[in-house]
Every structure is written in C-alpha cells, then in structure tokens.
C-alpha cells in the first residue's frame, strides 16, 4: 500500500466520497499492519478478515453510486471485548465467558455500523475490564505496559490496525492506555453513550468511549456513538476563545517532571492560540473521591458477579477476586454514603468547571511504566 493514511476520519470519508480512496484500501492497510505487528503486540482477540473485506466491498459499491451511510462510511474500527458485536464472541478476557457469542449488536455498535463503520473484530481487554494485566504489549516499547483495561484498543489504534476503536472506562481505562500508547481517548459524560450490551463492572461508573488518533477523530466517533448515524460531526465553531481551567493541585503535583513539562507546554500552546487561562482548585469533596470510587466499584462488581463468583471463584484473576471480596464485605451504609458522595462531588465539579471551560490536567502521572 503506497498511499498515506488520511489525517482524520472525516478526511478519509471525504476521500471515499470523491473516489480517491476505497473502504477496501483502508481495510487492507489495517490488515497489513496486523500482519506486521499482531504476533508481538497481541492487541486482538479475534479478527473477522473475511467479514471486514465483505463489508468494505459493499460499502465501496455504495460509495461508487454516490451513497454514503453516514459519517463513518468505510472506516475500519475495533471493538473492546466486553461490548457485543452480533456473531462474535464477547468473552471479557475471562475463561468464564469463553465462546459466549453475541446474538445482537450492543446499541453503541449498532449506531457505528449504521453510520458505515467496518467492524474488524474484538480487541483485548483485561479480565472483566478490571486490574489483572492483559497479554497486550505497549507498541512503542515491549517492556512497558500499554495500560488497561482498554489495552488492545489503544495499541491497535497506535499501530494503524484500525482507525479508531471502542474502549470503556470505570476508573481510567480509556484515558490511561490512550496516554501510554500515544493516542487520544475520550471518557464521555456519564450516560451520554448507552452501555446496554456491555459486560458491566459498575453501573454507577461505567462509560463507553472512543480511542482514536486525534481529538478530531474522537469528536466524529463520539457524535455517532451518542446521536447515531444522522449525527452532525462538523467541528463546532467557537464564538469566543475557550477558557482553560488548569487544575494545579494533586494531578500536577503527582506527575513526574516529564509529564508536568508536557502539560505546561500544551497549556502554553493553547494560550498562544488565543485561549484564556485560569487556575482552579479541587473541591473539598475530592479528598474522599478515590476511596468512595473504590467502594462503589467493589460493591457493584460483587453484585454483578454474585452468582458466578459463588460457584467459580477460583476461575477469576487475583485482582478481580480482591475487588469482589471487598464488595461482599462492604456495609450497606458505606455504599449508601459513597453514592451520596458521588452526587456531591459531581455537583462540586460542575460548579468549578462550566460547560464552556476546558479542564487541563495530565491523563497519567508518568509515561508508561515498565512491566505489565
């Protein structure tokens, strides 16, 4: 393949519309990247090569007749293996779900398919999208972690095995692997993207979001995921320069020098482009956030896995077992207090960060650490 990848998903779709690029060319490029790197990186659980080529040919025929299904027409994507794709297994990185074939698309997948996306296959996740490491390796240094739990999605996008991928986040499972693998990730506003057809961890914390090569691609993916094939993916024009709210405490304090320098450089670049800057402090309620988050996640995980864990506990990874055991031993009053604190912290942050303000903070305190 001797063509350069388009700079954005929208640019690729425009090239397909003009006949300068075909969906089959994009799929072939992704499959070539898999052939080069997958044996070392282990980003994919399964790839439906024949199905992807069939989808590409069908979408190419439509494009030649001037018919585009939507903003993702002909774009190859990966889907994290906790999200249902009709006819593919959803195993969530666990032997307990081995061979569990989805009978229908999750709503978020159905929206992407209706918008013209080509579903290449399922990407690797840590077990039940929790803490036990996956077999995926960091694409830039095999001795360092790719981050989890959306390990495969981030690595696949980084190496051009797909133009975008679905991930999920309960704590940092989109933003962390995206940062470690040098790509972009978006945790959407809670509830803006449906989580039906997704293996849950915590119904109070789970999000489905995109991983892609750029913020522009995240916007295109998110618009379709939230609003469907008819979504307006035009990048909005800003009437006034945006305001940057730099959260100076905790995140920047925890960051190492390299991450801190990159964050400051990014803020400076935005300032030079016309943005306004303000320093903000985290609310008092932040002090308990990590403990309350752990409480919610543990109890919700225990509720989700209650019956299976009782009969097959030994089949769970050690870190998932620890989480579930914590949830089983948590008092009801502590869980209720954690839910109340979640509501309080959300209100406190909304008072600090308005919708027209960009919060600036490192995605992770360090670059990808050595190890799994």
Predicted regions located by residue number:
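An N-terminal boundary/leader segment
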Residues: 1-54, 272-274
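Glycine-rich, small-residue loops and helix-cap segments
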Residues: 19, 30, 74, 80, ...
């Amino acid at each position: 393949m001797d063509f350069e990848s388009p700079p954005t998903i929208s640019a690729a779709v425009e090239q397909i519309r003009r006949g300068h690029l075909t969906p089959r060319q994009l799929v072939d490029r992704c499959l070539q990247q898999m052939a080069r790197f997958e044996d070392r990186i282990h980003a994919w659980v399964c790839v439906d090569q024949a199905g992807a080529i069939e989808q590409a040919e069908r979408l190419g025929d439509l494009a030649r007749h001037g018919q585009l299904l939507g903003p993702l027409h002909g774009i190859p994507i990966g889907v994290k293996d906790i999200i249902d794709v009709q006819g593919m297994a959803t195993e969530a990185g666990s032997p307990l779900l081995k061979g569990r074939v989805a009978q229908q698309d999750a709503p978020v997948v159905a929206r992407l398919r209706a918008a013209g996306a080509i579903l290449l296959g399922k990407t690797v996740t840590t077990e039940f999208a929790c803490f036990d490491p996956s077999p995926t390796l960091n694409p830039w240094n095999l001795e360092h972690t790719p981050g989890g739990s959306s390990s495969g999605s981030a690595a696949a996008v980084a190496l051009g095995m797909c133009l975008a991928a679905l991930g999920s986040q309960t704590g940092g499972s989109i933003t962390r692997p995206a940062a470690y693998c040098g790509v972009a990730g978006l945790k959407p506003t809670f509830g803006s993207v449906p989580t039906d057809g997704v293996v849950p961890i915590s119904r109070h914390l789970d999000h489905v979001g995109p991983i892609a090569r750029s913020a522009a691609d995240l916007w295109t993916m998110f618009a379709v995921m939230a609003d469907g094939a008819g979504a307006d993916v035009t990048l909005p024009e800003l009437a006034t320069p945006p305001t940057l709210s730099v959260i100076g405490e905790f995140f920047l304090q925890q960051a190492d020098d390299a991450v801190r320098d990159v964050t400051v450089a990014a803020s400076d670049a935005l300032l030079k482009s016309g943005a306004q800057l303000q320093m903000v402090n985290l609310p008092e309620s932040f002090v308990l956030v990590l403990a309350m988050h752990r409480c919610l996640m543990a109890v919700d995980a225990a509720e989700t896995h209650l019956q299976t864990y009782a009969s097959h506990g030994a089949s769970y990874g050690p870190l998932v077992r620890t989480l579930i055991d914590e949830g089983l031993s948590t008092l009801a009053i502590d869980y209720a207090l954690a839910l109340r604190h979640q509501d309080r912290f959300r209100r406190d942050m909304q008072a600090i960060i308005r919708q027209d303000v960009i919060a600036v903070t490192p995605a992770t305190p360090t670059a990808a650490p050595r190890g799994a």
